[in-house]
UniProtKB/Swiss-Prot annotation:
Its EC number is 2.7.6.1. The gene is PRPS2. Activated by magnesium and inorganic phosphate. Competitively or non-competitively inhibited by ADP, 2,3-bisphosphoglyceride or GDP. Belongs to the ribose-phosphate pyrophosphokinase family. InterPro entries: PRib_PP_synth_CS, Pribosyltran_N, PRibTrfase_dom, PRTase-like, Rib-P_diPkinase, Rib-P_diPkinase_bac. Mg(2+) binds at residues 135, 137, 146, 150. ATP binds at residues 96-101, 137. GO terms for biological process: 5-phosphoribose 1-diphosphate biosynthetic process; nucleotide biosynthetic process; pentose-phosphate shunt; ribonucleoside monophosphate biosynthetic process. This is Ribose-phosphate pyrophosphokinase 2. Gene3D superfamilies: 3.40.50.2020.
Amino acid sequence: MPNIVLFSGSSHHDLSQRVADRLGLELGKVVTKKFSNQETSVEIGESVRGEDVYIIQSGCGEINDNLMELLIMINACKIASSSRVTAVIPCFPYARQDKKDKKGAVERWSRAPISAKLVANMLSVAGADHIITMDLHASQIQGFFDIPVDNLYAEPAVLQWIKENILEWKNCIIVSPDAGGAKRVTSIADRLNVEFALIHKERKKANEVDRMVLVGDVKDRVAILVDDMADTCGTICHAADKLVSAGATKVYAILTHGIFSGPAISRINNAAFEAVVVTNTIPQEEKMKHCPKIQFIDISMILAEAIRRTHNGESVSYLFSHVPL
């Protein structure tokens, strides 16, 4: 069996180091830089001939630069005769652009790009043999690839966090901030043996504000909002206010991917949250300095175990329902 080599891109070195430590590995030598014209340069600093290569690069920060860096790293390892190249992408870039969506007038549908499919094509053409990611925004993105894709889930780690950190978890209710997340929250609610609710955004006519309609009873319960990602946090912060006004005793938000761009931090600080809990698929250190409500769940053990099992030819489905030690 070939040896395993683990490389880190520039997007999230802390997570890469955590994964390497759990695997008992040193991160491979790689130098990334930019030329004066802003082209990305990558130099792999060690032999990868015949090796099983894993490159960790999350879709965050300077997303376009980091995506290009990942593509170049994949290609550099592939043409250096590695036996297999796996791209480990904790937060998949462009995942929200997964279909032709209505963005105004109906006639604009035909001109909307499906950028997630384009990213899938680029990764394959660059030379990736396998993709490991987490909580894809749309699970059908797996079908955009002609190579194996392992979509891991943060759910087991989320369940563990709830049981360890919310004393009243048996009296909680799991809430989806929109109808699209109903399947996610029902799965968590079933495993906790609690009820679920959802918030439906009722679209108004032009020049009228959308109205949020709560479906479910949260009175005198701890409400836990669950979603796969939050960007500017307008939806979840309005949802938190709605839950408090409906009688929830406390409100938490648990998200896999905390993007937190634009006014997100100020909105969270001013919202009625006890805590906003995210995984570390995206770096959160700087944001936590400005927002004490943000906490994170470390998912490096899930990624590390997925890499170990993939390298050894073992099934990764165990990770869909268990948190590795």
